[in-house]
Amino acid sequence: MQLLNLGLLLLLPFVAGEIAPQPEPLRAGPSDIVPGQYIVTLKEGLASAQIREHKKWVSSVHQANLDSFAAGASGVETVGIMKNFHIHNLNMYSGGFDDKTAEDLRRSPDVKSVHPDQHVYLAKTVTQPQARWGLGYMSSKGMPVPLHSTLVDYLYDDKAGEGVWAYVLDTGINVDHIEFEDRGILGHNAIPNKPHTDEFEHGTYVAGIIAGKTYGVAKKANVVSAKAFDTGSSTYNYILETYDWIVKNITDSNRKNKAVINLSISGAKYQPFDDAVENAFKAGITAVVAAGNDGKDAKNNTPASSPNAITVGAVRWENTRPSLASNYGKIVDIWAPGELIKSCWKGGNNATSTQSGTSAASPHVAGLVAYLMSLENLPSPSAVTARVLNLTIPNLVKDAKDSPNRVVYNGIQERKFTLPKNTK
């Protein structure tokens, strides 16, 4: 049985000025599995005609099993194939199947894997007053900055992500928040019978760190809401649908070199979604992902373990891992601000909140990617990753454990760009 399924990362509250103790990570028990629902991954290299024939076969096998005694064994109502996903060379589908059909699928020569779908849980978020150190850290070469100071300068080129799109797979975004001006876009809502609004606040907070006019790293980037979570849970059925939509939208809009996906989500390793992130990379699309908040090696987390995503750990203002225990390990590519970070919030079009977690660290780096894309010709995700890592400042994190020890930096003090009169 796998551990907790992919969920939004914990944004931790503060109580009496201190970080609230983090609850033990949830473990996936039988109740986390969606009964009778599966994610099926097909083998690479199948022709379109083979895929069509496979799905016809699935429909016939499913119907035959429904008509048999075996179909009722699980006591679960089944519906057959539900949704189809195509990300670069990866073909997948979700479906509701009885136990016999699921076993038949596993034996099919066309099928790479059959995974039970799983519930995805949202972590609770509550509030702590103010902090503004994170942006100053981005341009300070990793030097410790005053925690509550509003005087820390954030230096950046005023192109600031202009002409770049940041896709936020999350709980939705309040695109009417004043921080987004006219740059917020409602993209895709995978949650049935729910409005395309942020009812949980996580997505709006993340988007504000990427592109808010006050709190954002890339203050002129567009943010696209891709809602895969509601106020309590989701499943990979919705997450894969949303990721599939994002990849298609980026591709169809000819934005591959001007788009970044932020995934402030984490859970136990789940290969179908890691495969989706990897195939989007092969298609030319950059993803930035959170390392997770379990205080463990991130190699066992999805999507942190996706080999070509940019995996982000969280640091405090004095270059230590937060007391909320950011994940670590060789899979962590970079460290970014992740404690006491102020950004947009729900509850009004000018609402703000201060939160902590690798959910906050990941959008700092996604914002940096958008910023660099607006300034430089970065022709591929590999070039983006190389540029981000080449700018990092080494050997500053005091407790990086087995992780590469490099913190985020936007390169402004070296005047890597032609910008003197455009610098803010």
From Swiss-Prot:
Alphabetical GO biological process terms: proteolysis
Q: Which residues form the Inhibitor I9 domain?
A: 37-123
Keywords tagged on the record: Glycoprotein, Hydrolase, Protease, Secreted, Serine protease, Signal, Virulence, Zymogen
Gene3D superfamilies with a match to the protein in the record:
Peptidase S8 propeptide/proteinase inhibitor I9, Peptidase S8/S53 domain
SUPFAM superfamilies, A to Z: Subtilisin-like
Sugar-modified residues: N249, N262, N350, N390
What CDD domains does the annotation carry? Peptidases_S8_PCSK9_ProteinaseK_like
EC numbers, comma separated: 3.4.21.-
Task: Name the Pfam families for this protein.
Answer: Inhibitor_I9 (PF05922), Peptidase_S8 (PF00082)
Active site at: D170 (charge relay system), H202 (charge relay system), S359 (charge relay system)
Which function does this protein serve?
Secreted subtilisin-like serine protease with keratinolytic activity that contributes to pathogenicity.
Name of the featured protein: Subtilisin-like protease 2
Q: Coding gene?
A: SUB2
